[in-house]
Amino acid sequence: MGCNFCKKKDYVRINYIAPDEKEIVLKDYSSSNDEPLIIVESTKNYFTQVQLVDFVNLLEQFNLETSGIITDEPMHSDFSSNDEFLSKSFTLEEFLSFVENKILILDDLSNSLEKNNIIIFKQFCGEMYKALESKLKDYHKEENSFNLIKKRNILAFGILFCDCENIEKIKLFFDIFKNEDKKEIFKSKELNDFLITLFLISSYCLITTRNNITNEDKGIRKLGKEELLNLLKTSELKNCENLLKIFNNTFFKKESYNWNDFKKQFEDIDNGFGWILFSRGIRRKLEEN
């Protein structure tokens, strides 16, 4: 069974605060093709509809040799038609270039972010990349056997950069992780555990930080640079065993998966894991662990 949001009828929902009610078309800035990669439709709720394959197409611009491998058809969970592309690697510098030139352009954040916030956000991206690289090196045991991150290993991580509403972001990962048939990128228990940890921490960091950027009038407390970096240090699995246990026991070890049950667990601050949405809660939990 493939992941639900990879099916043809589904799409990634991205929260985009549009300046007006008109349709916004985001051009592919690095392609000679005149057709836009992503069409953004501004609605009264300012939701945009972007297929997952469009996100992959943005990544594809890193390597022109893969041109044409990604088709107009949405991706399937086994990534079988995209193996050549997804097996490509890219460096930290290339990834940060993607963050700056693609993600910031995509979300139109460059006009709303203060220079210091952009630096912190890029540093956050870099730290997450290096944490994933370190974990993958440990998994492959040999120091030099995995010095570049495969695109297939960072695909799910990249979705976190879409500025979704909180519950919409979590729904994407619910649809990924709930499937037993995890195929390539989730077949390793060690890597899957690490991605779960990454999901918990980075979703908290990104939701808190980026909601603050676009919702300053709502009184969301800023996440300081030092606090953000301290949270990133917990990306090492050895420091997150209790965190993983909480998450696994309340959701992933169940025989059946129901979105409404998961939503309740996620929003339950005291007995679930809704605490990751609040800075005081995550600090308390991390201190306990």
Predicted regions and their residues:
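EF-hand Ca2+-binding helix-loop-helix modules
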Residues: C3-K141, K151-N179, S188
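EF-hand and EF-hand-like helix-loop-helix modules
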Residues: S42-T43, F55-E60, F95, S110-L132, ...
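A glycine-rich, coil/turn loop motif that links secondary-structure elements
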Residues: E142-N144, E184-I185
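A positional/structural detector of protein chain ends, strongest at the extreme C-terminus
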Residues: M1-N4, E287-N289
